[in-house]
């Protein structure tokens, strides 16, 4: 009887252990597959070598001498004589000064991490309203951190915005080792991100890293805002690309992209445009699951100390998150593992709820019609 009881207990423990291992495998297996298997095959041909050569010999003087042709506000001297480790370009809407102020008080206030200089600037297009433009001018005079391109800041012009800001980085901040493109809705853990980049310092070239999206199909619905005609992009799938909420590229990649901008179709989403440019120059996007992509990561301290970004973070949540990840309290391996599991589960639940609510809304609209 005692032996049978012991055996049953052993079997129970084995069953529990098996389920724990299976749970972790299912939870983190997707990230593992993304990290190691969802990459395009690298290639280097004569054309790619020519692009690299053009990028090295790039003459930026015509752009520098015609500032008013491209930018309303340029901050053209802000990088002069400085060696910047990370240039953060925060893509912001012209009328969202409140959000910019909040970022300036939190993660955007960082000027160095582990002694490595950080420069944070806001990237804008032109507003429709003259009043908003006057407010932006005042904000720029006060903070000296706004770049404003000469194009209307609209959803249709986000590719133009990407081009203008990469162009700015190449022309006016050529000593920046890395360039972070990030949306204003996104929270960034700069200490964690810089620590990751420091491990890449021996490989400063060909860096294009973020949450990589694989086998995304172009939208062929003419009624949809993101419609892409076959004449613009005839392939079945887009090339792998980094989700546009946040990604990083090295300075040499920015220069190569500047060279090929005019050869790439523009009637695609902005982040896809960057991915097509990357393919054009023979570049493989590097995936990291620590970039959240479109997803909002539910807040807890140890989780936010580990990840690089979280999208759609609310205004009240941002100061709390920034304060707690900088409180000096380190997380143990157990705490980090446990809270990462919690974060991931809650994020999946939130995604499911949004999908479910979206389905209900679509059905209601269908019956209303």
From Swiss-Prot:
It is a single-pass type II membrane protein. The chain crosses the membrane at residues 13-33. The keyword Iron-sulfur does not apply. Glycans are attached at residues 66, 96, 109. Residues 1-12 are cytoplasmic. Residues 34-369 are lumenal. Its main location: Golgi. It is found in: Golgi apparatus membrane. Putative glycosyltransferase that could catalyze the transfer of galactose residues from UDP-alpha-D-galactose. This is Beta-1,3-galactosyltransferase 9.
């Amino acid at each position: 009887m005692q032996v049978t009881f012991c055996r049953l207990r052993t079997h129970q423990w084995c069953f529990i252990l098996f389920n724990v291992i299976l749970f972790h495998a299912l939870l983190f297996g997707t990230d593992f597959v993304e990290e190691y298997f969802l990459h395009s095959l690298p290639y280097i041909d004569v054309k790619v070598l020519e692009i690299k050569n053009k990028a090295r010999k790039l003459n930026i003087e015509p752009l520098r001498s015609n500032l008013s042709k491209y930018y309303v506000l340029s901050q053209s001297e802000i990088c002069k004589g400085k060696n910047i480790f990370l240039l953060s370009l925060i893509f912001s809407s012209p009328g969202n000064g409140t959000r910019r102020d909040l970022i300036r008080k939190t993660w955007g206030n960082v000027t160095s991490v582990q002694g490595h200089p950080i420069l944070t600037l806001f990237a804008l297009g032109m507003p429709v309203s003259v009043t908003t433009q006057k407010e932006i001018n005042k904000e720029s005079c006060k903070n000296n951190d706004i770049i404003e391109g000469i194009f209307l800041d609209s959803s249709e012009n986000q590719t133009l915005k990407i081009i203008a800001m990469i162009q700015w980085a190449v022309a006016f901040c050529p000593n920046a080792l890395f360039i972070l493109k990030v949306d204003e809705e996104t929270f960034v853990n700069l200490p964690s991100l810089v620590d990751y980049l420091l491990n890449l310092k021996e490989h400063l070239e060909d860096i294009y890293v973020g949450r990589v999206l694989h086998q995304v199909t172009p939208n062929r619905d003419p009624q949809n805002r993101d419609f892409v005609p076959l004449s613009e992009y005839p392939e079945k799938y887009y090339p792998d690309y980094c989700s546009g909420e946040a990604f990083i590229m090295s300075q040499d990649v920015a220069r190569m992209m500047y060279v090929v901008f005019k050869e790439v179709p523009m009637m695609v989403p902005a982040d896809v445009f960057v991915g097509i440019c990357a393919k054009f120059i023979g570049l493989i996007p590097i995936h990291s699951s620590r970039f959240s992509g479109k997803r909002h990561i539910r807040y807890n301290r140890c989780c936010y100390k580990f990840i690089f970004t979280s999208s759609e973070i609310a205004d009240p949540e941002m100061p709390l998150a920034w304060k707690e990840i900088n409180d000096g309290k380190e997380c143990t391996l157990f705490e980090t593992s446990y809270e990462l599991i919690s974060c991931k589960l809650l994020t999946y639940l939130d995604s499911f709820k949004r999908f479910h609510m979206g389905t209900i809304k679509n059905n209601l609209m269908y019956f209303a019609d």
